């Protein structure tokens, strides 16, 4: 829960901030307003954070629209991800101090603001020697990619995975993390006018094979597996026909994990894949994973963020191409974030 939202009154002890507030669900450009909000000094287990940067993700849009699986109480400040610097701590806070960089690990906290007050256990420290854009975008897509590669199959150097939506934020993170582990990636993308430049960009990130949805359906796919083993793991963010085609190429006993449904089409599984190939089907939602681990093993969240930041520091995990805009220019950023085939991440600078 975002703890600093005070829209109508400003007590003597409160502090002024600005945030993108919505009082009802709807299209972001219609319901979001940049407003002055009031935040209080932190209580014993709270932290006041000056936000530095916060991206616009599809889940942020869905939350404002009211279609996401987790919805904050209204009125609310938008944004689930970002990086900020600690400016004040409550007297019982022990894991961070003023000057530390922090990122949220809970969803629905409201990061599209200049300052906010969060509970200590909803934040994790990150190093301040990595790029702001990397820190601001580390806690959603890279965390999803990290868990997809860690939790469903025991992957070793030389193994292969296949994924669709490979140019998405998660897809790009999967490519880079897999490359750092010596895992071969087969990356499926939609055909488009700038296909050659997209293929080159993904190869620059470490992609071994980049193919289109149409190529995925062709018999010539068998030639690809002369040079690499069939994938043990398939990562699905699309659904529909793309899912069925990836399943055809999955190795015996392999696993397909669905973490999104961009096509809004159901996952269709041939009976033969279940009976004769013994494939396993799973779903994954990083928000739920974090919620469960926060209660049982918070150190696993901290380790994941630490590992990802180390990859960023070593240049093995770069954030997606981005356009950074001041908070006041949020309308342009929101519009561009929903433009098809515009692959640049929109990041709000506070």
Curated annotation (Swiss-Prot):
Substrates-to-products reaction catalysed:
a 2,3-saturated acyl-[ACP] + NADP(+) = a (2E)-enoyl-[ACP] + NADPH + H(+)
Q: Where does NADP(+) bind?
A: 141, 167-170, 190-192, 259-262, 284-286, 345
Keyword set, alphabetical order: Developmental protein, Fatty acid biosynthesis, Fatty acid metabolism, Lipid biosynthesis, Lipid metabolism, Mitochondrion, NADP, Oxidoreductase, Transit peptide
- UniProt tissue specificity: Expressed in the developing pronephros.
Q: Which InterPro entries match?
A: ADH-like_C, ADH-like_N, GroES-like_sf, Mito_Enoyl-ACP_Reductase, NAD(P)-bd_dom_sf, PKS_ER
Q: Which SUPFAM superfamilies match?
A: GroES-like, NAD(P)-binding Rossmann-fold domains
Q: Which CDD domains match?
A: ETR
Q: Which GO terms describe its cellular component?
A: mitochondrion
Enzyme Commission number, as recorded: 1.3.1.104
Compartment(s) where it occurs, according to its Swiss-Prot or TrEMBL record: Mitochondrion
The main location class comes to mitochondrion
Subunit description: Homodimer.
What does the UniProt function comment say about this protein?
Answer: Catalyzes the NADPH-dependent reduction of trans-2-enoyl thioesters in mitochondrial fatty acid synthesis (fatty acid synthesis type II). Fatty acid chain elongation in mitochondria uses acyl carrier protein (ACP) as an acyl group carrier, but the enzyme accepts both ACP and CoA thioesters as substrates in vitro. May provide the octanoyl chain used for lipoic acid biosynthesis, regulating protein lipoylation and mitochondrial respiratory activity. Involved in iron homeostasis; affecting Fe-S cluster assembly and ceramide metabolism.
> What name does UniProt use for this protein?
Enoyl-[acyl-carrier-protein] reductase, mitochondrial
Whose protein is this, by species? Answer: Xenopus tropicalis (Western clawed frog)
